[in-house]
Amino acid sequence: MKKKILFVINTLGGAGAEMALLELLEKLEKENEKTKDVQYEISLYVLMGQGELVKKLPKEVLLKNKSYQPLSVLQKEGRHFMYRTILKTMFVRGTVCCLLPYLLSSRADMLKRRKVLPDKLLWRVLSDGGERFAEEYDLAVAYLEGGSAYYIADHVRAKKKAAFIHIDYTKAGYTRKLDRDCYLKYDAIFPIGEDVKQQFLKVYPECAGRTKVFHNIIDTEKIKTKASLPGGFSDDFAGIRLLTVGRLTEQKSYPTAIRAMKKIKEKHKNVRWYVLGEGPERKRLEHLIDSLGLQEDFILSGSVENPYPYYKSADIYVHATGFEGKSIAIQEAQTLGLPIIASESNREQIENGVDGILCRLEPEAVSEAVCRMMEDEKLRNRYREASLKKNVVYEKDMELLTGLLFR
């Protein structure tokens, strides 16, 4: 018996949600290998038609895009392609004309809330201007908020529909008006953590009965294997290495980390902070680093193919970020046994004083937490052991998704 599943995601770049989707697709492919009774025929449609992770797509997954470019939206060429895609979709089926009242009304609502987010408006344009597929699917899955959620709700024929939520819904700027109540059209909604679930249900309380936590899937054995491969830090620095992994975006609050590093250097000279990731905030962050004289101390290392040898060689993992859901980077750091410092928004993953330190997202608080951990080797070792024990693999969550096919 074959079951047709369509996944839709906004882009296929190197962010945490996209990596989690690849792990989920690989898991479904392995399910196909285990049994012949039920076979999943899996398709993927990428709304923007771009992203560098396409090369890691499992071989049995059918990419539905008529045209696709393996370009990162963080690169110049990738951004140009993105702008062309947006312009093109504006004129497909008269999208802009049809959406004009919605766009004007939503923008006015944003102005009233003093939170204008043009990207949120563009997701509706991209959704309505996207490709159309005639076939009906047994299950259609929107793997991100915004465009993919709108697209499946309005433009995909499926017996069952499911949507994933990866972020703090209200802090990210979404509203029911912006969504056009799209989540009322879904049979199941999967926030990736309990905190994410509670924030979502504040906006959509009537969806409580169909909303269940579905944790990010990570392959711990693959992470450990890749951590043992050649790579990692290439400098000859012999001091304490702090590591952060994440795209250079406003959401990640890197200015807080940079200013915290300035305070750390006032007390400790033998420490460096490395960031793995690329993004639109690079120039602004470089300017701040230069202005504080931290060129040799706060290192923007860019994106790397295999970050795990860096985790393995780091002394402390620091995750001082703004709003997001459940961090895959923290899960990876726990898998490799790093002591972790994180901002208070990560309470679901870190128990303060038990398997890491939680602190306010302020330079003073972050610097105090880092200095405390740097100065206490026994504390670092205790948190290392706790991180290794903390890592949990959520195998049963798969049944939440595949179970929809038989209801």
Predicted ranges, named:
Residues 303, 322:
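Aromatic "clamp/platform" in nucleotide-sugar-dependent glycosyltransferases that forms part
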Residues 352-353, 357-364, 372-377:
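Conserved acidic donor-binding segment of nucleotide-sugar-dependent glycosyltransferases
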Residues 18-23, 240-263, 280-286:
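A conserved mid-protein helix/loop that constitutes part of the nucleotide-sugar donor-binding site
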Residues 335, 339-342:
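Short hydrophobic beta-strand element within catalytic cores of glycosyltransferases
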Residues 44-51, 245, 249, 272-285:
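Glycosyltransferase donor-sugar binding loop
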Residues 160-166, 170, 184-225:
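Donor nucleotide-sugar binding/catalytic pocket of nucleotide-sugar-dependent glycosyltransferases
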Residues 308, 326-335, 347-348, 354:
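Short alpha-helical segment that forms part of, or immediately flanks, the ligand-binding pocket
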Residues 228-229, 361, 378-407:
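A charged, aromatic-enriched C-terminal amphipathic alpha-helix characteristic of glycosyltransferases
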